[in-house]
Amino acid sequence: MKPGKRTLRGIISDAMGVCADNKLLWTPDLPIVYMDNPKSGSTTIKNSLKQAQAAEYMRAGIAFRRSEEPHKADDCLKNRGLRRSACSHRFLISCVRNPFTRALSGYLDKVATRDPRYFPELRDRSVENFEQHLLAIADHRPKRLNFHFRPQHINLDFPNINYDAIFYLENLSAVSRFFAEMSPKITLETSAPHSRSANSKLRDHYTDRAVKLVQEIYAQDFSVFGYGSNLDDASVSPGECIVGGRIVAEGEEFLDMASRRPTRTASCKAFDATMRYHRLIDMLMI
């Protein structure tokens, strides 16, 4: 029997050493490539890029198609057609979030409000509260988790892929300053229609066991992104952003480092593999 598309992509992505459903998004006229990372400011970033690109089209008198849904690709924010050569003059960025608040936000948005059986990792499991949700995903292979629940270092393939900048949701002002430096045409348009105010609900859902489960499931996220593993520190940003694999301390100037000519992906084998994988998808080969 012929394997389904999801299964086939999983097999091929494993062989290539990439994540099967990571999402590279780009704008035709702006120097940004964004690696999607759900529940970590993705709606705000995508909406901002769409707004800026739409304004560019209108200034040039070019007709374009734009979806009001920020998560849907359109002429303003594309998920196909990016060529490796076009990345040499674009900045690769993403944004991360404290694992405690991100894990709870994913549960409140995607599980508590719908039938958990929608997600393969939760199928055949009793999921009546946040702790049971964590127990279910703890039993699942991390790379096969839905990317709302998956560890962020897998979504970003970090530190294998070299990013020009990785920002923190807890410090969105750094994103705003970066966008202003990259192009005066990009303004950070805060948008969070799927927000579940997870930060204010931590004590309502976190048991001692749930805390330990998040510390175990997302141990590498805490480590590589610099987050403290204490629940009381869930709203604290580790710094301004990550540039060149280094966490830039809060208050330290980072724009000069982050806004240099984007060359960090130039000799990055992990990024090359990701681009080849997306090329196969573009060509409808998988």
Segments from the language model and where they lie:
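Membrane-interface amphipathic segments in extracytoplasmic regions
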Residues: 1-284
